[in-house]
From Swiss-Prot:
Localization in the cell: Nucleus
Protein's job: The TFIID basal transcription factor complex plays a major role in the initiation of RNA polymerase II (Pol II)-dependent transcription. TFIID recognizes and binds promoters via its subunit tbp-1, a TATA-box-binding protein, and promotes assembly of the pre-initiation complex (PIC). The TFIID complex consists of tbp-1 and TBP-associated factors (TAFs), including taf-10. Essential for early embryonic development, but not required for transcription of some genes; probably acts via activating transcription initiation by RNA Pol II, as part of the TFIID complex.
Lineage: Eukaryota, Metazoa, Ecdysozoa, Nematoda, Chromadorea
Coiled-coil blocks: none
GO MF annotations, alphabetized: promoter-specific chromatin binding
Pfam families: TAF10
Keywords associated with the record: Nucleus, Transcription, Transcription regulation
GO annotations of cellular component type: nucleus; SAGA complex; transcription factor TFIID complex
Protein name (record): Transcription initiation factor TFIID subunit 10
Gene Ontology BP annotations: embryo development ending in birth or egg hatching; positive regulation of transcription by RNA polymerase II; regulation of mitotic cell cycle, embryonic; transcription initiation at RNA polymerase II promoter
CDD domains documented for this protein: HFD_TAF10
InterPro entries: TAF10
PANTHER family for the chain: TRANSCRIPTION INITIATION FACTOR TFIID SUBUNIT 10 (PTHR21242:SF0)
Family: Belongs to the TAF10 family.
Organism the protein comes from: Caenorhabditis elegans
Length: 179
């Protein structure tokens, strides 16, 4: 009984009601093994008959439209549209500041669209850092509430900023005379 290849049901009702225990792939029986499930069981019959049906017209149209959409690659069109719209977008970090830091990093004569994209990426990075710092301040309860209002104001401290910058892989070095 312990040998999986020698498993045989003890009675004829067991072969109809219970499937054999799950076996690893290398213990699987050959394809000519007797059928365990009854041919009268409706759920098995329904599954078998529905497996080999051809697709309906609506299903074929859906598959065709899906293939066309995948082949068009709309994300590439969206990317080109986004890059072209960068010229109309006034960045928070001015182009002159971005160009200065690009030149100091050794990048010369970059495309204005690339400059805008780098400016936008820097803005996103800074906003993520500040959002994380504010979330940390809220979790620590460092806000101040005035008596007349219910608004809580949070102050961004260097200690909070140091924690968040370490998470992002930046090191905030303070001058020795800083208190």
């Amino acid at each position: 009984m312990n040998d999986p290849e020698q498993y045989e049901p003890s009675s004829s009702t067991e072969s109809v009601l219970m499937p054999p225990p799950a076996l690893p792939q290398y213990f699987q029986r050959p394809a000519a093994a007797p059928q365990v499930y009854s041919t009268l069981e409706p759920s098995v019959q329904n599954l078998r008959s529905s497996l080999h049906k051809p697709l309906t017209g609506n299903q074929q149209q859906f598959v065709q439209k899906t293939l066309e959409n995948v082949q068009k690659n709309p994300s590439q069109d969206d990317t080109h549209e986004f890059i072209n719209q960068l010229a109309d977008y006034p960045p928070t970090i001015p182009d002159s500041v971005t160009l200065h830091f690009l030149k100091s990093a050794g990048v010369d004569g970059s495309d204005p669209r690339v400059t805008r994209m780098i400016s936008l990426a820097a803005q996103k990075h800074v906003s993520d850092i500040i959002l994380d710092a504010m979330t940390s301040a809220r979790m620590k309860g460092l806000g101040q509430t005035k008596k007349g209002t219910k608004d809580t104001k949070y102050t961004l401290t260097e200690e909070l900023l140091d924690e968040i910058l370490k998470e992002y892989g930046h090191q905030n070095t303070r001058p020795p005379y800083h208190t």
